[in-house]
């Protein structure tokens, strides 16, 4: 879990300055969060599911192209996002989402992340 990012290992990969240099590459948080948000919105707008998931995957894979992640980070982030979405639904995150969807997802994502850290 403490793998260095591609652009840190290979300085020849040019990236923009980023705070992510201080955090491990695995798994991709962008991929994970994109999947969670896409699944939530797709639950409200089922006809848009294909496009939403495509956008989520493009967001996550863009981080591979940019040199911030390996493909395995992207894959793990997607899988983690799918699993976290299921768990978040079991935690009943509807109340916060109804009021402010973006804030509600951040709150429950943080709650679940903290819970998972305690288990590991």
Feature locations, PLM:
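Membrane-embedded catalytic cores of phosphoryl/pyrophosphoryl-handling enzymes
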Residues: 3, 7-120
């Amino acid at each position: 879990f403490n793998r260095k990012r591609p652009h840190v290992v290979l300085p020849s990969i040019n990236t923009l300055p980023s705070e992510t240099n201080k955090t491990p590459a695995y798994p991709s948080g962008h991929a994970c969060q994109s999947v969670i948000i896409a699944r939530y919105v797709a639950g409200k707008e089922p006809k848009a599911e294909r496009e939403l998931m495509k956008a989520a995957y493009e967001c996550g894979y863009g981080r591979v192209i940019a040199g911030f992640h390996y493909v395995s980070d992207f894959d793990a982030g997607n899988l983690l996002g799918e699993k976290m979405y299921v768990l978040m639904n079991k935690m009943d995150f509807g109340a916060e989402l109804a009021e402010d969807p973006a804030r509600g997802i951040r709150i429950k994502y943080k709650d679940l992340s903290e819970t998972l850290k305690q288990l590991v």
